[in-house]
Amino acid sequence: MFFLTVGSPGLRLAPQATSTEVMGFIHLFGDKRMPIWGILALLSNLLLVLFSGSRHRTFYLLSLSMLILFVVIYDRLSKPINRLQTAAARTGRRLDNAGALQASWDRSLMMRVPLLAVSMLAQFIALFCSASAVFE
């Protein structure tokens, strides 16, 4: 959320070559380090779907579905842009369509963020309902 609200608008003020280089190096590390957290989120939600009580299983299934959709959108829309920016940053090459690529990446982010929000909200509702049942 930090980068969406602060980093991205700040980078828009920088020259396109600088923006491409910075985003390329961010993706160089992010694309290697972030998948483990996504895998753990998917796995934990899958386990909750399989082993939770039937009352809350729907919320966990909704959460898992949102995460799967998030990964599909990332893989189809964001990852190819990440690769282009990373390759450009590594080689010092300038991308003629850098602004359009970043705008496309930002649009894909605006699709993915609500999916994460719905996933977290579904988990919260399931947890809240479970906690409420304990205290009744």
Protein language model annotation of sequence segments:
Residues L50-L69:
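Interfacial segments of alpha-helical transmembrane regions
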Residues I36-L48, L64, R112-L121:
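Core segments of transmembrane alpha-helices
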Residues M34, L69-F70:
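Alpha-helical transmembrane segments of multi-pass integral membrane proteins
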